[in-house]
Amino acid sequence: MSSVDKQNLTNRMRISVSHFAGASNANSIKKERKKKIFNVLLKVFKIIVYAFFLGIGLYGCFQNMANHWTINSTIVGNGFELGFHVDPILGANDIRFDLIYSGTGPWYPMSDFSFDYGPFYALFVWPIAQILLHFMYATRDWPAGLNAILGLIIILLIIRVITMLISARATIQTERISEIQGKIAEINAKYKDAKDMQSRQKKQMETKELYQKHNVKPLAPFESMIITLPIFLIIYRVVTILRPLKFISIFYIWDLSATPISEIFSNFTTSGWPYIFFLLIIIPVQILSQKIPQLLARKRNRNATTVGAKNKQQLKRVRMTQNIIAIVLAVVVAISASGIGLYWFFNAIFTILQSYIIHVIIMKRRSNSATRIESKLAKLGIS
């Protein structure tokens, strides 16, 4: 082969390589562009969903306070009530389920899907109430309110499945934030006395880089809180307006439509005193469901906790917030219908189990990761 042919072959190979590299770069640019577009669309979708849930939650909250027909009543056939239509064909022919007026006081029945009471009741309360209503009717002969207990557990599982991804993401993000608390404390200490704009920007940049490095989304833990508000209102309204629940007494002791604190003060010597035991069961379990995830997180991240403890003022604020939440939850359980307390009891048990399972999974992953690292070091002759 002559030198001219060799030169031509070399030039062709260079052109081919440059074309291949250009095509590869173009493909990578396209992929990166698609990824950016997908991330933007995902963020917009999340904002719309969370704004919707927050809006519907606030709407339901204000509606419950403002509209006269949302009045609660423990009296059968009174207040806002949801049940079956009174009809030989459509109805259940059972006074516990068919909507029949008591004859006194205001009464606002809801037997069919309708927007007459607003979108909150039509789109959220109605579907959940129908599941519980039909399940309780199918198991209406069960004794001691066992059908109501199992029905509430089914509702809890449905809601947990729907919100599983959000709650799991919030838990993982909280875990990641706990793991980098020590490094965050170091950044805060580094710029403790810095007041100029440049130093503040550097602090923000370092914190942002730390979050990106560990894939931390600081606002992710608050996502579950946005979903929690409408869910609480939905369950609250289902328990307080569902007609058959007004006939249920758990183990023939606790009336699900009654308010524990009212029963204790109004009928202590007769039916009120058992509600003390109701609160002594529900409230401690609810508090444990708040404390156990924190204790497990501390156990997983002892180093982060030790470093973070240097900032005693911040630690005090966190503990104070936790105590306030625990007190608020206890008060809400005491002043709400017993059905709410029962639902929260099962929810608390589920939260404790979920926290323990997540703890075991994380510890196993860390153990496996440490084993792999030790194996690689051993292969390199480092031990």
From Swiss-Prot:
Keywords: Cell membrane, Chaperone, Membrane, Protein transport, Transmembrane, Transmembrane helix, Transport. GO terms for biological process: protein insertion into membrane; protein transport. It holds the Pfam family 60KD_IMP. InterPro entries: YidC/ALB3/OXA1/COX18, YidC/Oxa/ALB_C, YidC_ALB_C. Its main location: membrane. Disulfide bonds: none annotated. The chain crosses the membrane at residues 40-60, 118-138, 148-168, 222-242, 245-265, 268-288, 324-344, 345-365. GO terms for molecular function: membrane insertase activity. It is a multi-pass membrane protein. GO terms for cellular component: plasma membrane. It comes from the Bacteria. It is found in: Cell membrane. Interacts with the Sec translocase complex via SecD. Specifically interacts with transmembrane segments of nascent integral membrane proteins during membrane integration. Required for the insertion and/or proper folding and/or complex formation of integral membrane proteins into the membrane. Involved in integration of membrane proteins that insert both dependently and independently of the Sec translocase complex, as well as at least some lipoproteins. Aids folding of multispanning membrane proteins. NCBIfam families: PRK02201.1-1, yidC_oxa1_cterm. Belongs to the OXA1/ALB3/YidC family. Type 1 subfamily. This is Membrane protein insertase YidC.
